C-alpha cells in the first residue's frame, strides 16, 4: 500500500464503531484500538483527518478543535454539500476509510468515492458491523455482515488493508513528503 501525502482519513460513524455494544462483539476492542491508532497516526503525521457522522465518547477518536466534522445528509459521507468540495480544495486523490458499518455509511461512501475517481482503501480491522436479519428471517452475525461487506468492496471499489499496513503507509507518505520538500 502506497499512500500519497494527500491521503485523507475518513472516520465514519466512530460513535457507532466504538460506543455501540451491539456491533460485532468479537472484534470490538481491536476495531476501537485500530481506529484510535489510525486517528493518532494521522494527527501525528499532520495528515488530513475528517470525522463523519456523530461524535464518539471515546477520547482517543473524539474530534479535536480544528478538525473537520461532517454530518451526513444520507447514506454516504458525500450526501450533502461539504465533503466533495473540501476534498477538491485539498487536492485529495486517496481516501482511507474506517469506522462503523451499522448504517452502511462506510460502504456507501466507498462506492461513491470510487465513482468520483478517488483511490479508496478500507481498513478492515478498523471497521465494525451490526447483526442483520435477511428476508427469510435468518440472523446473520455482525462478523459475517462485516466480512461480506468487505468482500463486496474488495476489488474495483476499494483495496482492503489492515491497520498495520495503513499505519506504515501513512508514516511513509509523510516521510516522502518531507524528503521532497527538502529537495525543493
What would you call each of these model-derived segments?
Residues 1-8, 34-40, 44-47, 55-184:
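Active-site-adjacent betaalpha module
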Residues 15-21:
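Short acidic, Gly/Ser-rich segments with clustered Asp/Glu that frequently serve as metal-coordination loops
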Residues 8-14:
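N-terminal nucleotide-binding beta1-loop-alpha1 segment
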Residues 22-29, 137-139:
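Short glycine-enriched, charge-decorated loop/helix-capping segments at active-site entrances
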Amino acid at each position: 500500500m502506497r499512500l500519497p501525502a494527500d491521503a485523507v482519513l475518513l472516520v465514519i460513524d466512530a460513535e457507532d464503531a466504538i460506543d455501540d455494544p451491539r456491533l460485532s462483539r468479537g472484534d470490538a476492542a481491536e476495531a476501537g484500538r485500530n481506529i484510535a491508532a489510525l486517528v493518532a497516526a494521522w494527527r501525528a503525521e499532520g495528515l488530513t483527518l475528517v470525522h463523519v457522522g456523530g461524535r464518539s465518547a471515546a477520547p482517543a477518536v473524539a474530534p479535536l478543535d480544528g478538525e473537520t466534522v461532517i454530518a451526513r445528509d444520507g447514506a454516504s459521507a458525500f450526501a450533502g454539500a461539504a465533503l466533495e468540495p473540501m476534498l477538491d480544495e485539498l487536492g485529495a486523490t486517496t481516501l482511507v476509510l474506517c469506522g462503523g458499518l451499522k448504517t452502511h455509511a462506510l460502504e456507501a461512501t466507498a462506492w461513491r468515492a470510487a465513482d468520483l475517481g478517488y483511490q479508496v482503501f478500507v481498513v478492515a480491522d478498523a471497521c465494525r458491523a451490526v447483526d442483520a436479519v435477511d428476508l427469510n428471517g435468518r440472523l446473520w452475525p455482525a462478523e459475517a455482515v462485516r466480512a461480506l461487506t468487505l468482500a463486496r468492496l474488495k476489488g474495483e471499489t476499494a483495496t482492503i488493508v489492515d491497520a498495520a499496513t495503513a499505519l506504515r503507509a501513512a508514516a511513509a507518505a509523510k516521510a516522502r513528503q518531507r524528503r521532497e520538500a527538502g529537495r525543493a
